[in-house]
Amino acid sequence: MADFKLSTSIRYDPILLDAPKHEDLDTTDWNRKVASPWYMLDYHRDRMLKAATHFGWKSAVEKIEGLEGLKRLEDFLTPFTRSAGLKPHRVKILLDEDGTLKHEFSPAQQTSLNNMFPSYLPAPEEAKEAAVNISARATPGKLPEYEIYVDSAATSHTEFTHYKTTKRQMYDDARKRLHLALADPKEVLLVNPTDGSIMEGSFTTPFFWRNNRWVTPPVSQGFQEGNGSGGNEGTTRRWALERGLAIEEKVMARSLQNGEECWISNGVRGFIFGRIKI
């Protein structure tokens, strides 16, 4: 048995039950077709399936592949929905090599459907005149505002930065260097040691404003050593790229400016506004 588990952290939130009623929201197929309290469950399944396939975990693949696998994952989570009540939660799903599923949970902050499924990411204040005028209805809120720092050390690109697993020491170390607690409204950006580009956040995907558009560090399709920024194939990252909210582009750590506006996202909190702190 491997000494790690595959993981993905998903949002449980009863307000998602209303998502299919909101025609202005461009959700995933899961949240469009199913009245479900689970945020992008289909994308969370897909990321675990890719990881299980990469590591050659046949039993884990069989557990969650196909429509039957997605249903098994939903059924596994159903007992939690009966006991969680109306408050949002962060639920970490763990998948073992033998196909065993487990979960851990904790309370999550309130957020809106607009921050889970934004029609666009608002341009920075200084760039509004240059940006394309977008009359979107699902505008994400900018509160709470996160402080975004750049790690002082580099982090190696490995299969454990590409795929989300319980091997997270590199992310914990990055937060420790800045003395960041998990509850702090703060994030730290990891830096690729090869070229000094931004890889990802310790628990989020970052988006930066470059040439009048939002960009996010490139990630290879499947783990390829030396290709891409070295970051994770996140669920909200995938969603944003598929809908044209951002494109992939390398962003050098040295290009970031103090006070620069940015967005970060993940599968628990949706899209969050932030500012770079140098």
Question: Which residue stretches match the model-derived regions?
Answer:
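Helix-start/capping segments and mature chain N-termini
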Residues: 1-80, 87-90, 95-278
